């Protein structure tokens, strides 16, 4: 058996077409959606991510602003800029690209963003709302994974789901969204004693560790859906995920490739969250 590929690129194009239509409708009413992106420092990966986010806004009818600062920017100046963006009616979403330089407290920065503009879904108010099942924004990567599972009609109610990784950005919110969908969820991490004992019983596995080959064929239940959130480089410098793709695709029922799987969905869901924020604001001021 060879797994069916979950095509994140194709799904993201469909969702972006919907975003563009909604953005056009808002703009026609004088409410063009706007995303502010802030980059501090010169991390090469962050520069690529930010460039892709700004381009995605432009391509789909969203306005965007891009503030780029040197790595030695004082924390107080960054917080002051966030305060300005919070009060700017043209901006519906604020994204501060992580990681930040060591002298800047990322928690303080995230908490400075107005919850109604926190389109990454990282603010403590939004994290708490996610816990209670009433999120204002769902974090982009887990939200994208849920859209993929739904698009391929992978059943979650009553399913055993394993999330490998416990980060605030992916692992924890991923587990909560799967739980909300009716799955029985296990979170595994670096201290888990026997990872394979958990994954072999899973109908759905989401790997989000940043470790190559954390999931291999003998660890996967035949027919399972395997979602690879990882972004790594192999020995030849080629982009790869956390999953041993060549081996696992011969056992799994569904699998996401890297690249072309979860990656395109993350930016797409950022656009979706920004559109939702703009629609919410337009409705409140109608």
From Swiss-Prot:
Which keywords accompany this UniProt record? Amino-acid biosynthesis, Histidine biosynthesis, Hydrolase, Methionine biosynthesis, Multifunctional enzyme, NADP, One-carbon metabolism, Oxidoreductase, Purine biosynthesis
Q: Which GO terms describe its cellular component?
A: cytosol
| Functional pathway | One-carbon metabolism; tetrahydrofolate interconversion
InterPro entries documented for this protein: Aminoacid_DH-like_N_sf (IPR046346), NAD(P)-bd_dom_sf (IPR036291), THF_DH/CycHdrlase (IPR000672), THF_DH/CycHdrlase_cat_dom (IPR020630), THF_DH/CycHdrlase_CS (IPR020867), THF_DH/CycHdrlase_NAD-bd_dom (IPR020631)
Q: Identify the EC number(s).
A: 1.5.1.5, 3.5.4.9
An annotated Gene Ontology molecular function: methenyltetrahydrofolate cyclohydrolase activity
Recorded family membership: Belongs to the tetrahydrofolate dehydrogenase/cyclohydrolase family.
Q: What NCBIfam families would the database entry show?
A: PRK10792.1 (NF008058), PRK14186.1 (NF010783), PRK14189.1 (NF010786)
**What assembly does the database describe for this protein?**
Homodimer.
Query: What this chain does, per the record?
Result: Catalyzes the oxidation of 5,10-methylenetetrahydrofolate to 5,10-methenyltetrahydrofolate and then the hydrolysis of 5,10-methenyltetrahydrofolate to 10-formyltetrahydrofolate.
Protein name as annotated: Bifunctional protein FolD
Q: Give the species this sequence originates from.
A: Paraburkholderia phytofirmans (strain DSM 17436 / LMG 22146 / PsJN)
């Amino acid at each position: 058996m060879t797994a069916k590929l979950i095509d994140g690129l194709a799904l993201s194009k469909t969702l972006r077409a919907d975003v563009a239509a909604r953005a056009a409708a808002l703009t026609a009413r004088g409410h063009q959606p706007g995303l502010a992106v802030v980059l501090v420092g010169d991390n090469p990966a962050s520069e690529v991510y930010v460039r892709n986010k700004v381009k995605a806004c432009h391509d789909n009818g969203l306005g965007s602003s891009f503030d780029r600062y040197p790595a030695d920017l004082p924390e107080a100046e960054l917080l002051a800029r966030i305060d300005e963006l919070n009060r700017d009616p043209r901006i519906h979403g604020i994204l501060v690209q992580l990681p930040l330089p060591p002298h800047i407290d990322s928690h303080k920065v995230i908490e400075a963003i107005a919850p109604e503009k926190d389109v990454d879904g990282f603010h403590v108010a939004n994290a708490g709302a996610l816990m209670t099942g009433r999120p204002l924004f769902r974090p982009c990567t887990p939200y994208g994974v849920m859209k993929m599972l739904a698009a391929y009609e992978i059943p979650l109610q009553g399913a055993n789901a394993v999330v490998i990784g416990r980060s605030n950005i992916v692992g924890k919110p991923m587990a909560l969204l799967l739980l909300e969908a009716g799955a029985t969820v296990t979170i595994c991490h670096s201290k888990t004693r026997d990872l394979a004992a958990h994954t072999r019983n899973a109908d759905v596995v989401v790997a989000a560790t940043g470790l190559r080959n954390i999931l291999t064929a003998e660890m996967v239940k035949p027919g399972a859906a395997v979602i690879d959130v990882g972004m790594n480089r192999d020995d030849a410098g080629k982009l790869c995920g956390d999953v041993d793709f060549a081996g696992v695709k011969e056992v799994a029922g569904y699998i996401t490739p890297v690249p072309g799987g979860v990656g395109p969905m993350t930016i797409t869901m950022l656009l979706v969250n920004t559109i939702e924020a703009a629609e919410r604001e337009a409705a409140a001021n109608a």
